[in-house]
Regions:
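Conserved catalytic-core motifs of GNAT/GCN5-like acyltransferases
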Residues: 79, 84-98
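Glycine-centered loop/turn motif at secondary-structure junctions
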Residues: 9-10, 62, 79-82
Length: 99
């Protein structure tokens, strides 16, 4: 499965994409700089499935994910996936790899 795709029946549908960068070459953290889900797939669980895939890949690489949530609604979404707020304004969130 390509990043940003979800298997729906026998078809693979691109529902959105994550963009992840390494803030520095030596660290074990990656910044989730963009997380986009196509409007037609919002509110249907596909964004959660995509973020779950991103988190699983980060866990395999033992990578911390960091990101800025643009709103409390988004912060709540990321919190459901293991991110915690580490700064209030802007809302900076981090997720440590699962053991």
């Amino acid at each position: 499965m390509k990043p940003g795709t979800i298997e729906l029946g026998n078809a693979s549908v691109r529902v959105g994409y994550p963009q992840i960068i390494a803030p520095n070459q030596r660290g074990h953290a990656r910044e989730l700089t963009e997380f986009f889900v196509s409007e037609e797939y919002r509110g249907k669980g596909e964004g959660s499935a995509l973020l779950k895939e991103v988190c699983e890949q980060a866990d395999q690489g033992k990578l911390m994910l960091i990101m800025i949530a643009d709103s409390l609604r988004l912060a709540s979404f990321y919190a459901r996936h293991g991110f915690i707020a580490i700064q209030a304004n802007p809302i900076l969130m981090a997720r440590t790899p699962a053991s």
